[in-house]
Each structure stands twice: as structure tokens, then as C-alpha cells.
Amino acid sequence: MNYKNSKFYVENISIGKLTRSFQTPFYCYSKSRLNQNIKNFNKNFEKTKPLICFSVKSNSNSKLLKIIKDNGLGADVVSIGELQKVLKVGFKPNKIVFSGVGKTTNELDFAIKKKILLINVES
């Protein structure tokens, strides 16, 4: 994101052009900024290489999730809907953590059958 000639740009596209192309308000994400932020974040953990999981509850946009997956991060989900979504986006089961309270037997069975990495049991 930057300014050129007193106009605000995201990845070389002016916000003015976007507002003429899309109904406002809208969300605008920078793929290059997201990739860079993930790279910088991961750099701090090079020695330990933990599985860093993105909270799908915070933003379940499929295109955003694909970028996150393509950068090697995992997914932290709290519902069967989120679990199904990240599987559809292409997250590997061994990079999915199922958190949250109030899991149904159906949700737990589904998660176990998909062989996800971890189910957090909370009160």
C-alpha cells in the first residue's frame, strides 16, 4: 500500500479505481503484503519450525485461506463448517487443529475420520 500523486494504491491499483469497480464498502487485501508478513513471521521461528495455525474464525475468505495454506501455515477451526471449508481449500489434515467448546459427536467423528492433527478439548 502506498501513495502516488496523492492517490492511495494497493498493489499498483488505485483505491479510486476499485471503488468505481466494486460496490462500497468492500474489503481489499494485498496478496504480496500477506505473503511478506507470513514470510517475516516464519523467519522468527526458523530454528524451532512450529506449526503456525491461522484462526479461520477471524477470516474465512477462501482466497485468503488459500494464500495462507500456500505459505505452509495450518488452520485453527472451531466448527465443522470451518473444517469442511479448509479441507475444500486444500489444507492437509495434518495441519488442522480443531478448537473451541461444545463439539457434537458428529463433529468429533468427522474430524477423527479426516485424521486431523489435533482436537483441543475445552470446558
Please annotate each region the language model reported.
Residues 1-118:
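A charged N-terminal "starter" segment
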